[in-house]
Each structure stands twice: as C-alpha cells, then as structure tokens.
A protein has these predicted regions:
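Active-site-proximal alpha-helix that buttresses catalytic centers in soluble enzyme cores
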Residues: 2-86, 112, 123-129, 161
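Generic beta-sheet signal
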Residues: 3, 99-107, 111
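Glycine-rich phosphate-binding loop signature in dinucleotide/nucleotide-binding domains
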Residues: 41-43, 95-101
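Short, surface-exposed amphipathic charged segments that create phosphate/polyanion-binding patches used
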Residues: 87-94
Length: 161
C-alpha cells in the first residue's frame, strides 16, 4: 500500500485554540502546489485520513479541489499533533489488510515525522515543512519503505533551475 503523509499548510499563529488555527493564504497556495504536483505523479488516492484540526481539514479541502479524492474521509483524533502514532500505524495496517492501494494522511508535526519512523523502523524522522509530503510503501507484513519526500520549496527550486 502506498501511504502519502502530508503536513498541513502554513497556518496563522494567533487563534482561540490550536485546533482552530486556519490556513494562511500562503498555506493554501503551497498546499495547492503540492496537490497539483501529486496529481501530476498519477497518484490515485483510495482513502483519506485527516486530523480534526481546522488547518488539516482546510488542507484537505485545497487538495480535494486539485485532484480526485474518495468521498469517504476518516477524521481521526489520533492524527492531532500529540496523537498516538502506534494507533495510526495499526489503522494503516488494517487498511493494507483490506487491500486498499493508497492512502493520503493529513496531519501535524511531530506526528508526521514519527509516523514515517513507526512505519519504517530505523528511519530517522524526516523534517516536514508545511505542505510537505512523504511517501512510504507498506508491505503485507507491515514493514514500510521510505521512498521520497517533496516540499513546496523543492518544487519552487526545481522550477527556478
């Protein structure tokens, strides 16, 4: 199963609580850039898992405007910044056992980095800029292989060359 792990877009710092911080215009733009890039990779997302926090849900909305996503979206409290990475990993393994081919996960720091390490034992948690996406292949036994990571900055630099 292909797992695409995305950190939410850039969000405002000042809000009534962490859970209601909205995306900035830059966060929307960078999430759109990444979604269009992912679409260009011919990725077919079969399931979506998202944090209940506003900025993650807004990131999902932007991604959904750019590429075809399934109607079913699983909103998981385990995907909040201090969520349980073990539970998320177990959930992903259950999806793999259901023969789901690809999953998009939209979450937060530090969980996104820890999730890569949880799925790929021995892998150092990668740094995730806002809107960055990492790809992991999860095999039938539950062992993950870290394939790549892409960020808005990488795409902007490649375009400048």
């Amino acid at each position: 199963m292909q797992v695409f792990i995305m950190r939410h877009g850039d969000a405002v710092l000042d809000a009534a609580s962490d859970s209601v911080r909205p995306l900035t215009p830059c966060g929307c733009d960078e999430s759109r850039l990444m979604a269009n890039w992912l679409k260009g990779q011919k990725v077919d997302i079969e399931r979506v898992l998202v944090s209940p926090f506003l900025r993650a849900e807004q990131t999902l909305d932007v991604v959904g405007d750019c590429m075809n996503l399934p109607a079913q979206v699983d909103v998981l409290p385990e995907l909040t910044p201090c969520g349980d990475v073990g539970l998320v990993s177990a959930y992903l393994q259950a999806l793999a056992n259901e023969e789901i081919g690809s999953v998009l996960v939209i979450s937060h720091l530090p969980l996104v980095g820890y999730l890569v390490s949880e799925l790929c034992p021995g892998e150092t948690p990668p740094m995730f800029t806002t809107s960055a996406i990492a790809n992991v292949t999860l095999d039938e036994s539950g062992k993950g292989t870290f394939n790549w990571q892409m960020s808005p900055c990488n795409l902007k630099m490649a375009k400048a060359i």
